[in-house]
Amino acid sequence: SPRVLDLCAGTGCLGLGVKRFCPDAQATCVEKSPEAFRYLEQNVRTALPGAAPAVQAVQGDLFTYWQSLPEGQLDLIVSNPPYLTAEEMQHLQPEVAQEPAMALEAGDDGLVFYRALAQHYRDALRPGGALVLEIGWQQRQTVMELLAGNGWADIECRRDYGGNDRCIIAHRPK
């Protein structure tokens, strides 16, 4: 069974989506926000009837959770971390401005979560295992460089339906 970790899981969309696509997967969804965690727990219980034993909700922090992971045990890590800069936070569209700042802001340069992911999560993956990250539309080059500088391999960017850079895929070297 593939082992999947969803970091900054929010309500669990990514982890539960992987589980729906790959029913044999064992997914762990990690979320720091107490408010979002309540929704995550509810979704784990109800979104995929019969899947709950293989989907675990954990209240935890991306910046420390890596310390509890054994080496080489995961097949896939997915994350849609906060990625807005402090400047971008001041110019949000009204519908986005209603979201909790904790779910959006990632420090002055918008990269604090990507730095932690690049530095601390590679070895939790089995050789060849993948990391899939949502990124902001101007972050492609910087995030790819962060990953490459921390020993990730086969790094590529995928675009969304609007043609914007949206997703980075990287692998632990084989």
Report residues per predicted region.
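Conserved Class I SAM-dependent methyltransferase catalytic core
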Residues: 108-171
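C-terminal beta-strand of the catalytic ATP-binding
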Residues: 83, 171-174
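Class I S-adenosylmethionine-dependent transferase superfamily signal
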Residues: 18, 96, 117-121
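Structural motif
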Residues: 68-69, 96, 123, 147
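Conserved SAM/SAH cofactor-binding pocket of Class I
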Residues: 1-89
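Mobile active-site "lid"/loop adjacent to the S-adenosyl-L-methionine
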Residues: 83-113
